[in-house]
């Protein structure tokens, strides 16, 4: 058994020429590329979706040694978007029509042993293909290229094609295998290795699954995602005194866990899980789908650790690296077959069924996956087609329930779970529809597969009221899905902004529907999710204050509502170092069902009137309440407040003077506000809001240690303009000039504008090791630089 990574040495042409498949093609101009690769890097916005829709070609030359005689040579592509035809030495050897799943090509019969060989790929990324997800309008781009890793394996004529293990939380298991070639007389050996390194061995025949039970297992769960490793060996018994021979072995990680999806929700190992998730688009600025494993894994880390999600919905099968990270982190995954709204003809449907097979067979050993999506998202009912998708998936994996995302009520329910796209909330009233009014069968599971972002997009550079409105809408729907009995949970749309077609988005080819921008910089609405995390240490405390306290950002200079998104026990407010008030979450208010309701900061005066104006202790709170009402309601007073004003013998002019002294700051220096998040009786996080005095460019590298191999590696970089207190400056739109030093190259432009005070870039390795730096320069701020270390993997 030999394994080779095949991600270097490729040549690319953006225009496919049949000559590329020949042994020699000197007439072609080919570009050296490393995988993963996109057929066309796009600008951040105002891109043209026609640019990546093309028939392109890839080529790789290699030497096939004579020692491969009698062996099987397999070439595996992680994904090629979207229709791939593979040639070996001019001969067509394989065709694959899904840009989101892997495929393996048997090169054996086409090889010239002891000679140079050529593999070529005809890559069709045009959107008129009669395969999913194409055929209708799409609110996302589909890109093109060999967008995941490629490897070559040299095996015996008989080998393991697939392994799959079914488990229960108690330790019971059943192992299934699939083989290729002549295996008469062969046996199987299965080895299960625990995280501590202990091993258990089992033997079996090829015709039957291997069954058994492991004692004292640690179940896989969200809080404790314990992973075991299964290794299956295909063994040919020795004859004539010769030892047994291992023909092939295949490994996968798995977890012991039990899933149940019923009318009451999802139960993992017997415990109900309230799903709190986001939808993830697997695309990135400039590169589309073509990003290495470390960047894929980073998305899972952001979802679980930064955003506090326990689940994610994927509308297409993702990179295996993303699923690996979900397994390790305890992030539940709802993965769906490719497609959006459109269902095509019989040829299209046949490919969709094949996509379902590949999705399940390639992903089913991942314990993080809890639900298969077997309907084209948002499509109309199609009984015969969706009966087949359900049957196909249940046959290949009877351990998980099926679901289908739809946007209509009372749709035909052939699946185990009714997944509903609920965009019913418009800022008032109940945040989601009643489950009983939507699903045709209340005995089955129910979840909300999408909400909010498409209904109320928000750019990071929108004004403060708009950004706050989006955040409160997310909070309202999250709250009401929790409050409604029988709703298993919800998935907000969506994690990040993304490039889209001209028919969608804001006219610049971007859908600003994410709680993060395309570079994974958080918007205010991200704090709604992040603040729902259960804190276990002071570093887990989140505090995001919705207002910059700049009254000029609001119509008429009236600031309106101010909210704090926090998982602290309480919030203290100080004005110019004077204590104003302490606030706690309202457990009976609009967001009472949330684990950590956002806190409305409704008092900006407190006892300051008593301290500085000499107003007595009884009257001061009443006057403060009137002033806070004026702040909230643009100087309008309710009849009750007017009556109070007269009873306190205050004139309107006196009230206005107090308002501008303590709230409106007209004619006096702007106040300094300090917000303290209190946890276990002490302040553990502080936010200070005051006029900007200095600007700093903050540069954060999410993965500063890179390893080149088996593909190029990549560092994600976040850029933020912040003030002297670390607050984001959302209206800073300066350009940042980037330059790389060392074995790195910048993906995308070297000059990037800040949008909403934020930007980003990606740094790719070049195949060499060594120290590296990124230099960032912005007018009005000190230059900044960050250091990275690049290593090369030893072969």
Where are the model-predicted features located?
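The feature marks long extracellular or luminal low-complexity segments
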Residues: 268, 489, 500-501, 506-511, ...
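Accessory beta-strand-rich segments of carbohydrate-active enzymes
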Residues: 3-16, 38, 49, 53-160, ...
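Active-site-adjacent substrate/metal-binding segments within catalytic domains
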Residues: 39-64, 68-76, 81-88, 94-95, ...
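Extended acidic/polar, glycine-enriched regions
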Residues: 112-116, 181-260
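Substrate-binding/catalytic cleft of secreted carbohydrate-active enzymes
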Residues: 174-176, 301-305, 310-527, 532, ...
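Short acidic/polar inter-strand loop motif in beta-rich domains
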Residues: 124-131, 237-242, 679-684, 779-784
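Accessory carbohydrate-binding/adhesion or oligomerization-edge regions at the termini
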Residues: 1-43, 122, 471, 475-478, ...
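Short strand-edge motifs at loop-to-beta-strand transitions and within beta-strands
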Residues: 58-60, 101-105, 206-212, 759-761
């Amino acid at each position: 058994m030999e394994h080779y990574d095949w991600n270097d040495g490729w040549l690319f042409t953006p225009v496919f020429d049949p000559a590329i498949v020949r042994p020699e093609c000197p007439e072609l101009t080919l570009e050296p590329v490393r995988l993963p690769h996109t057929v066309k890097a796009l600008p951040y916005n105002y891109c043209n979706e026609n640019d990546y829709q093309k028939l392109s070609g890839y080529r790789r030359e290699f030497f096939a040694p004579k020692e491969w005689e009698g062996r099987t040579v397999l070439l595996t592509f992680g994904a090629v978007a979207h229709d791939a035809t593979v040639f070996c030495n001019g001969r067509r050897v394989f065709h694959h029509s899904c840009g989101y799943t892997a495929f393996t090509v048997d090169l054996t019969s086409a090889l010239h042993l002891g000679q140079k060989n050529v593999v070529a790929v005809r890559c069709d990324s045009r959107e008129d293909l009669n395969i999913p997800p194409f055929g209708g309008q799409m609110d996302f781009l589909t890109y093109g290229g060999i967008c995941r890793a490629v490897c070559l394996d040299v095996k015996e004529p008989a080998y393991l094609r697939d392994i799959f293990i079914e488990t229960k939380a108690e330790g019971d298991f059943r192992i299934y295998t699939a083989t290729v070639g002549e295996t008469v007389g062969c046996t199987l050996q299965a080895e299960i290795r625990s995280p501590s390194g202990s091993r258990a061995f089992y033997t079996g025949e090829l015709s039957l699954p291997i069954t058994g039970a492991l004692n004292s297992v640690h179940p896989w769960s969200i809080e404790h995602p314990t992973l075991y490793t299964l290794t299956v060996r295909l063994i040919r018994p020795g004859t004539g005194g010769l030892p047994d021979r291992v023909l092939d072995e295949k490994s996968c990680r798995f977890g012991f866990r039990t899933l149940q999806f019923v009318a009451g929700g999802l139960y993992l190992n017997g415990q109900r899980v309230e799903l709190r998730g986001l939808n993830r688009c697997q695309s990135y600025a400039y590169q589309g789908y073509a990003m290495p494993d470390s960047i894929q894994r980073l998305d899972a880390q952001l979802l679980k650790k930064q955003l506090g999600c326990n689940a994610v919905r994927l509308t297409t099968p993702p990179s295996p690296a993303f699923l690996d990270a979900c397994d390790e982190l305890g992030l539940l995954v709802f993965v769906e077959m490719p497609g959006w709204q459109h269902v095509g003809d019989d040829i299209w449907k046949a490919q969709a069924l094949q996509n379902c097979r590949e999705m399940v067979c390639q992903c089913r050993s991942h314990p993080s996956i809890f639900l298969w999506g077997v309907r084209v998202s948002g499509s109309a009912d199609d009984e015969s087609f969706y009966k087949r998708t359900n049957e196909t998936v249940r046959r290949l994996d009877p351990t998980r329930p099926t679901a289908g995302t739809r946007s209509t009520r009372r749709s035909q329910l052939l699946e185990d779970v009714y997944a509903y796209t609920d965009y019913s909330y418009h800022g008032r009233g109940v945040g989601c529809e009643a489950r009983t009014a939507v699903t045709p069968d209340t005995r089955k599971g129910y979840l909300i597969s999408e909400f909010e972002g498409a209904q109320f997009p928000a750019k990071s550079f929108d004004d403060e009221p708009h950004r706050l409105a989006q955040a409160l809408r997310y909070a309202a729907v999250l709250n009401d899905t929790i409050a409604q009995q029988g709703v298993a949970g919800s998935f907000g749309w969506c994690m990040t902004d993304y490039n889209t077609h001209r028919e969608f988005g804001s006219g610049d080819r971007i859908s600003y529907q994410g709680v993060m921008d395309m570079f994974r910089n958080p918007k205010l609405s991200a704090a709604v999710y992040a603040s729902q995390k259960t804190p276990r240490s002071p570093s887990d405390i989140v505090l995001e204050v919705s207002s910059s306290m700049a009254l000029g950002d609001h119509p008429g200079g009236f600031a309106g509502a101010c909210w704090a998104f926090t998982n602290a026990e309480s919030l203290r407010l100080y004005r110019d170092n004077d204590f104003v008030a302490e606030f706690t979450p309202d457990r009976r208010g609009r967001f009472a069902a949330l684990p950590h309701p956002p806190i409305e900061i409704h008092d900006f005066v407190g006892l300051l009137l008593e301290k500085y104006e000499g107003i007595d202790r009884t009257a001061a709170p009443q006057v403060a309440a009137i002033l806070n009402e004026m702040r909230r309601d643009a100087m309008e007073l309710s009849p009750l407040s007017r009556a109070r004003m007269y009873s306190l013998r205050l004139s309107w002019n006196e009230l206005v003077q107090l308002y501008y002294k303590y709230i409106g700051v007209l004619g006096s220096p702007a106040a300094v506000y300090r917000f303290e998040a209190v946890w276990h009786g002490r302040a553990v996080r502080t936010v200070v809001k005051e006029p900007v005095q200095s600007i700093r460019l903050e540069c954060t590298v999410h993965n500063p240690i890179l390893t080149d191999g088996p593909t190029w590696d990549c560092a994600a970089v976040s850029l933020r303009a912040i003030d002297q207190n670390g607050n984001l400056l959302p209206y800073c739109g300066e350009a940042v000039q980037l330059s790389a030093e060392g074995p790195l190259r910048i993906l995308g432009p070297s000059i990037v504008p800040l949008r909403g005070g934020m930007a980003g870039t990606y740094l790719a390795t070049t195949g060499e090791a060594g120290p590296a730096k990124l230099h960032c320069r912005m007018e009005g701020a000190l230059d900044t630089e960050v250091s990275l270390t690049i290593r090369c993997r030893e072969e």
